[in-house]
């Protein structure tokens, strides 16, 4: 029994190794549940009981899978990595939803799975109408799911699997990583994972310290730090960040949302004092330029429509909204819907684009937009000068035709999924603008609320079928669509 699914010479999917690693992931998830359990005990809340029960069950099942599914063949191929990446996020959400079902403010199975998937994918959409009624333990668990999902479940687990072959680690890394290029930041993926999570943790601790200097308690500082650096957007208050009425808090969150939207490869370069390389990066400069461009347009709309109410209304408030939307964080600091139809239209576009690849953000990624713009310029130049010898380069690296085709295919499927989600909600009787905004939010892992979702971004109005569809769209968006879609191809399952 110990060497279940051991087929060293087989070309079939290595189910034994997949279950072995999945068992380790479940043990990691069980360990994370200790934090909200401790929080419940500190605040004298009864929700420590479901956390203790669920953590124990998750640990036992994970340990059993890790022990019995321990194959001789430890090689992971590309198909294995893609399957494991998809299954891991679903399994994490299935066990992660149990605290929401067994707590003092229970959700049904549709709502609980939606909430867990929204957390782990850092979407930030919620079905909880009044989060302030939840226990501190549940609020901590919501925030923690986003912190875990920020860099990725697979990436975190790779820090604890030293025995996994490097090619297998690379397959898992690519299956979960985002963008048109995947940089290996270290010789071994396990070392890369430790480096990234170490940096992620340091930034989180720094953010907690800075938030504690403002008008916000330690518990809320920890929760918002988890959901800010992960660009997730869950809050401990129904009105979100607006409840604090603090320019300082908004400024700190803008700074770290911006950092969360930057490729961690660039952050490591900055850490190593390679600032010149950071500034020369095409995508980083376009990221800055995009924020500046949208800031000018949003401020112009605010002034034109007479919504100027003081210096905050034309400085930190529009900047907060832009960075929140572009980085797919989804924090709300006020009623931005009142700024006019232009701002709503720009918000759609910002949600679509997203920030940099290799960051914690959702969306199509600025990297792809940079490639499309450069490719468009190249095509126009070739049309004028047919014999022109040139290539499409991003950050000094040539993007070959195969990568270009992948970008085009991704944009097409990404847009199709948004349309599909919008049509599903329209068919269920929701207004067309609200339906497509909600679909945008889920596919781009954004979570911003507007229209029927309101400032709280609550999706409790959705019927059960709508919640399951939106949950699937969140997962597709987090795994950059292609990884999930390939599982439905018959050729994927052939040896």
Q: Which functions belong to the PLM regions below?
A:
Residues 1-495:
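Membrane-proximal intracellular helices of multi-pass ion channels
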